[in-house]
Amino acid sequence: MKDQITHLPDNADRSVAKQKFKITNWPTYNKALINRGSITFWLDDEAIQAWYESATLSSRGRPQRYSDLAITTVLVIKRVFRLTLRAAQGFIDSIFSLMNVPLRCPDYSCVSRRAKSVNVSFKTPTRGEIAHLVIDSTGLKVFGEGEWKVKKHGQERRRIWRKLHLAVDSKTHEIICADLSLNNVTDSEAFPGLIRQTHRKIRAASADGAYDTRLCHDELRRKKISALIPPRKGAGYWPGEYADRNRAVANQRMTGSNARWKWTTDYNRRSIAETAMYRVKQLFGGSLTLRDYDGQVAEAMALVRALNKMTKAGMPESVRIA
């Protein structure tokens, strides 16, 4: 954080020239980009060795043939290569054949059914304190026309969306928490369940003005996290226990906007959450294909798992040059 407000430049509220950066780890990052297209990067030894479910004598009912990891792997490959379930089945079977591995891909109907109950793990083995967690949400389309058709001919059929909520470590770009909700669930309503997914110590959390509610601030206070949420225009003071918010309100009243407060608190690091949303749309598209809501949750978490795997493989490190 910046220690003194006097360091704020006079033109902080005005737009500035676009900064230029140079990637300092290009060879490593370039190799990571190439590896994203390798099938063995996604269908690795861990998945192959745990492809079939281990038999357990204590369980009741018909045992599952394929493990949760196998179903998760199929969903991840489906998202990464943008395949249908049937195409993913044929694709994976052909890979097993070329690798001379005595395995079979789960039938597409099996994947569709198991997706409703599978637990897709997307968390990385990273541990320790998180200095700054940034939070945002975006919409993923389930049903409806494309943007171009709507622009040219208007909206003809109902459009259905789901909201993907992400909490991202601003230092590592890893997605720490993720959730999928119906479109009518507000960001602030989804926030408590999202932040409770991690038990790691968090110093500060940034979110936009949509999260400026008692519900969100109470959850951050409960977890002893510093709240970096800009108050809405004309916001009033809350009771004394909401010290973080009251300081932001005082700054807003003193300066007439939240600009100075954002600069002095490093709130603008929240743009990393927007970067994560951009990566989701660019790498995997902005839609979900499974029809059942529980299946859509699994599909979204598979997408998050894939993005974390890409992040762990290598991210660009840059320095400002202009």
Language-model segments: which ranges?
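Charged, often Cys/His-bearing segments associated with DNA-binding zinc-finger transcription factors
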Residues: 1-60, 65, 73, 103, ...
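Short, motif-level signal for alpha-helix interfacial/capping segments enriched in acidic residues
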Residues: 1-6, 113-118, 185-190, 250-256
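Helix-centered, glycine/charged polyanion-binding patches within enzymatic domains
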Residues: 7, 14-18, 209-282, 290
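Acidic, contiguous segments within the catalytic cores of piggyBac-derived transposases
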Residues: 31-34, 38-54, 248, 257-273, ...
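Polybasic low-complexity intrinsically disordered regions
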Residues: 56-72, 76, 80-86, 90, ...
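Short arginine-rich
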Residues: 99-102, 309
